[in-house]
Amino acid sequence: MRQVCCSALPPPPLEKGRCSSYSDSSSSSSERSSSSSSSSSESGSSSRSSSNNSSISRPAAPPEPRPQQQPQPRSPAARRAAARSRAAAAGGMRRDPAPGFSMLLFGVSLACYSPSLKSVQDQAYKAPVVVEGKVQGLVPAGGSSSNSTREPPASGRVALVKVLDKWPLRSGGLQREQVISVGSCVPLERNQRYIFFLEPTEQPLVFKTAFAPLDTNGKNLKKEVGKILCTDCATRPKLKKMKSQTGQVGEKQSLKCEAAAGNPQPSYRWFKDGKELNRSRDIRIKYGNGRKNSRLQFNKVKVEDAGEYVCEAENILGKDTVRGRLYVNSVSTTLSSWSGHARKCNETAKSYCVNGGVCYYIEGINQLSCKCPNGFFGQRCLEKLPLRLYMPDPKQKAEELYQKRVLTITGICVALLVVGIVCVVAYCKTKKQRKQMHNHLRQNMCPAHQNRSLANGPSHPRLDPEEIQMADYISKNVPATDHVIRRETETTFSGSHSCSPSHHCSTATPTSSHRHESHTWSLERSESLTSDSQSGIMLSSVGTSKCNSPACVEARARRAAAYNLEERRRATAPPYHDSVDSLRDSPHSERYVSALTTPARLSPVDFHYSLATQVPTFEITSPNSAHAVSLPPAAPISYRLAEQQPLLRHPAPPGPGPGPGPGPGPGADMQRSYDSYYYPAAGPGPRRGTCALGGSLGSLPASPFRIPEDDEYETTQECAPPPPPRPRARGASRRTSAGPRRWRRSRLNGLAAQRARAARDSLSLSSGSGGGSASASDDDADDADGALAAESTPFLGLRGAHDALRSDSPPLCPAADSRTYYSLDSHSTRASSRHSRGPPPRAKQDSAPL
């Protein structure tokens, strides 16, 4: 149906007879014109009839409601009045202020008859001017602008459009923000945006619509238009080469036609044997990738589908074609032997077989036969086979599923096994490292071998030798009442006296506020504590270890022999007097050395730490700092030049001693034999001014962790009394006799042998008694000389030094009982007064062998 957009004004003379399809505006304008002309006409009925006569509807226009027609006047006057009214109406059209408006409406009417294209791109490409604009207002037929927003959309009017966007290829010389007049035959809404496909007119800024405007709301029209209106975007289609396909009867096959280029998007058509193919039950035409390709698909290909196919692509710029073939192979069947004489049926007999069966004509018998597809059988493939005959075997699917499950479970098990192996390896490695760490710590805590034990000393940390208390250790030969428990006492040192060559040097001895209640080691017996501790470190606790080697057994036998010899001598000896090793808790005793060298777990010693805080201590360190031994410091050292030579015996000053010496007798013979060993040139007996050797008979080598040059030695001197006896007072004789009994010894580097200790004891006993068995004393002296000669080899040079000092040096020690300790002068007086009171009760030494 065609639609004509007409103006509200009367048409020009050439267009007389055209009418408007919109009668509401024309009728209203006719009524206004008739009412205006009724003032000059004869009657209103004649004017209405004239206006009605001017409104003639075409058959193509939709039916419009028309007013009831009045009967025409038959009189000539009425006819003349009607003619005048028509002339007045014609004169109103000629007075239109817009003379080009009729041209615009004529163009709009032509635009409405233009055929619509399928693609928006086609419309944009064919339209001379394409802009995006916004409707600002609608101009009614009277020429006044419509400002009412509630007015319904008007059609057949001129719209005032503001240009918002344009495309360079189709701009038509327009600029943005420019207002143009557009005549449209479709309803337009005010303040709405449209894409206008326009054609220019004779009037500037006046356009007519080539295609219906498109609303841009909710559509991607601008993008589609931009794809075709860009520079060098529009191209004719160009198709790719089509691939030929080969398939079996009943299979699904397809032919693909794809465009390599083409803008706007081309449309596709398929042809076979010059005939266009359309969609059917067996053939489908599909498009893909935004209609860039087309696919001709056969659901079940047949033998008759084989042939040549043509694909044609076309757009507004041109078209292109491509060709391809489809080959269909018949499936081999179990026909009889005469199948070699069969041929395909003609086109007229192909419909003999149904359900996709292929028809064959068997020559000789002139009979048609069908090759049925899977699932059908019979003469014409009418019967359908059971589903189980042509469907896949469910057992096969179950077998495949089972295999997949087995593979999955196997993979999981292998993964778990690998994880377990990794965990076990990590655990074993960690355990090995932990074991190595424990072994290392155990080696650091416990001695690994004998040398380390000797070097590191006791296993208890930071032990002060002064704090060793001999508790729970009962000697075999000493009664329980004779054991002494060491108590903590306050010890003071007095070092106010200075040393000089003519003055006797002595060292301060510790004094106790309760001397009658506690028995402590005097400094004269304990000042060589550091040396004994260092030598004790080198001694191993052989008594507590297992003895399996021959050397160990031999050493134990020797110690047992020495022990028996000492026991026999002690049994025949007179009452005990003080000697070097007489005190049970002396640093020179076997118990003390054994306590230092025995591990803490086997030692019968209780350790107490009561060292005064004001007395600094020092440590004997070893490579293993955990076994360092802390020792108390020595007293301040002040000694003479002559005392710097360690373990050298100096002759006593010539002249009478303070008391009578040992008279002729067995004791004197033993003394002479003792002195004759060390001083062969001195004569048969000890001369005046000679010094007895005392208790220092030799020492073991120094500890490998102690530098002997750093030790501060102290010399012990014992001056033998003059041979001629003199009558003295009782107290003086006691003081004099106490002299040879109190052997002086230096700081030892090792432990004296048993035989040397026995010799010293026997000498002390014989000299204290004054008259004993001469034969026994001589034998003991000979044994002692042998022992001394065996253990004094490190000091063979003592004789020369003694002779030189005896001949050239002045007397360095008095005849009285004195010891050259470094800074105490009150020691000799205290010692003499103590000995004058009488010998203390003898405390037997430990009879157990080392």
Swiss-Prot record:
Comp. bias regions, Low complexity: 20-59, 75-92, 494-506, 750-767
Positions with biased composition (Pro residues): 60-74, 651-665
Keywords from the named record: Cell membrane, Disulfide bond, EGF-like domain, Glycoprotein, Growth factor, Immunoglobulin domain, Membrane, Secreted, Transmembrane, Transmembrane helix
Record organism: Homo sapiens (Human)
Example GO molecular function: growth factor activity
Tissue expr: Restricted to the cerebellum in the adult.
Protein task: Direct ligand for ERBB3 and ERBB4 tyrosine kinase receptors. Concomitantly recruits ERBB1 and ERBB2 coreceptors, resulting in ligand-stimulated tyrosine phosphorylation and activation of the ERBB receptors. May also promote the heterodimerization with the EGF receptor.
This protein's name: Pro-neuregulin-2, membrane-bound isoform
Comment, domains: The cytoplasmic domain may be involved in the regulation of trafficking and proteolytic processing. Regulation of the proteolytic processing involves initial intracellular domain dimerization.
Coiled-coil annotated residue ranges, if any: none
Extracellular side: 112-405
Transmembrane segments: 406-426
SS bond list: C257-C311, C345-C359, C353-C370, C372-C381
Domain of life according to the entry: Eukaryota
Pfam families (alphabetical): I-set (PF07679), Neuregulin (PF02158)
